[in-house]
Amino acid sequence: MAKRIVAIYDRGIDKNLMQGFDVLEKYGYELTLVEKTVNEDELAYQNSMLSVEVNGPDGTPISEEVFQYLDDAEIIITHFAPVSRRMIEAAKNLKIIATLRTGMENINMEAAKERGIKVINAPGRAAVAVADFTVAAMLCEIRNIARTDEDIKTGGWTKKYPNRTYSDNMCNLCLLYTSDAADD
């Protein structure tokens, strides 16, 4: 009997991307792809991500279809789908939970630890995007881009901002970071 991997796909990591784990079949695994929430639209997906952040994995619903495949699963691969205590308890043979993101707030870590299940994440996955955003946000703040945009949209035209005394001379800028972005 093949060992089962349950790969739960969503709008962020879709079925085609998850299908790439079929390379593990040569090691005796059977890959089962299941959708986190059937026909989830973009707004529902965003709300689900917010729910994971606010309510945790046990307070965020997931398709009941997922539970059909958990009984003999040794590995669960997920992106943003919650892996609740109920899911972990349903997966009697579970050894590994892998999330394709840096954060692990979508996984009930306490339940995984109690069962001795290894949890694997993808540290640094968003490091380049975070670094890009950080530099862009700094420029936006220094040059008053968001303030000016909002001001113009509401009929204003501010000429002098509170940071004007130093925003014109940004020759010296130091970035200190502790993330994996430096490695990329």
Language-model features: where?
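Short loop/turn and capping residues at structural boundaries
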Residues: 35, 123, 162-163
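Phosphate/diphosphate ligand-binding glycine-rich loop within oxidoreductases
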Residues: 71-154
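Residues that mark the start of a beta-strand
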Residues: 4-5, 172-176
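Conserved small/polar residues in nucleotide/adenosyl-binding loops
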Residues: 177-182
